[in-house]
Amino acid sequence: MGTCLTTAEQRAMEVPAASVKGGGGRRSDEEAPGRIAGNGAGNVACLFTRQGKKGTNQDAMVAWENYNGRSDTVFCGVFDGHGPHGHLIARKVRDILPSRLCDLIYEDCGDSPTSNSDVSTLEENLSPYADAECRSPTLAGQKEHQEFFNAMKESFRKAFKNVDKELKLQRNIDSICSGTTAVTLIKQGHDLIVGNLGDSRAVLGTRDQNDKLVAHQLTVDLKPDHPREARRIRRCNGRVFAHQDEPDVARLWLPNCNSPGLAMARAFGDFCLKDFGLISVPDVTYRQITEKDEFIVLATDGVWDVLSNQEVVDVVASCSGRFAAARSVVDLANETWRFKYPTSKTDDCAVVCLFLNKYEVTGGLSGQPGYSPRMPALSGITRPNSKRVTPDDVDDGSDSNVSGDERSLDGFTRLNTLLALPKFGDTSPTKK
């Protein structure tokens, strides 16, 4: 395997000229075979989104089978916009990120995957949040997986950086105080690369040693109060603190005014904060898929704010028709929102379910064959015993006086991603 694609593989692949970089005849992503960006299903993935009660649906999603011209490769992503133009930014990133990443994979994989001058050692650049199974392939002495991971990680980082630059140059989208999260993955054969930006989440449904289906979180919500994120933000003169009305929600603020109060430490857009610690560098991790791994769920925080990882995995596993899995998760999340928080506005929800074994997605939507999800008696209505993972639950070697118990999200947040838009003509602090 070595790198993403060997030289021989690249020559042998029959990729339509319109689907790769070069020339003016490139086909738009919307016309690409195997690409789904709305409610529906393909051979190995299903998608569903539903607007909440806060206004325009700012969530976006995509699944692209036969990605990169390979029958064994799929790209998936969900994007949660915020701010006045968050819906436009989420859709823009959804539409351009996969193709930009595809271009860079072709560029990078034929050369040395990572320059030592650009990126330090592999172990230093691994996510400080990833579980041991998602950390450096070199730990297992697998050189070919290290090369694959290095090359793909560099492609992810370049693609995210380039997309952020494109957003800044967009004249028809104001991204000064608007942005989006992104949790994305590429599955190529048994290799899985996850790139995460913000607080959307990827969760794996896998079998444990007792053959019980359990949830394994592949990403960690990148919040401003994680020690490493907070140190970077403060070095850049940004501020991290919780508003008095939301003492449990740390936010990122401008140096001299109490805005915008962004509830994440990494995002596309939000250029008013890019000089003050907000970054668009993805947290990239690697995992080898095994026969025990059954599916992956990508979802925005409208789902994770009310359902635990295990509840989502249980819902997907209980669906008789895989086409309905994503919709079943959204249905349960909406039901739980209404039950738990009857006075709160339901958040937008977007879900992508990627199935890892050989069986294809079957069934249909509600009212069609295959839609009879046996949901676990709305288990989300009762407070789960399992603790939602936060950055502080993972030891990154930093000195922190905050214990895991103090940070456990036993209750669920219903926060707005942005609290206030900055007034750039007035640098005096605003009163809250």
Curated annotation (Swiss-Prot):
It is an enzyme of class 3 (hydrolase). SMART domains: PP2Cc (SM00332). Mn(2+) 1 binds at residues 80-81. Keywords: Hydrolase, Magnesium, Manganese, Metal-binding, Protein phosphatase. Its EC number is 3.1.3.16. Mn(2+) 2 binds at residues 80, 301, 347. InterPro entries: PP2C, PPM-type-like_dom_sf, PPM-type_phosphatase-like_dom. Its cofactor is Mg(2+); Mn(2+). Residues 44-356 form the PPM-type phosphatase domain. Belongs to the PP2C family. This is Probable protein phosphatase 2C 75. It comes from Oryza sativa subsp. japonica (Rice).
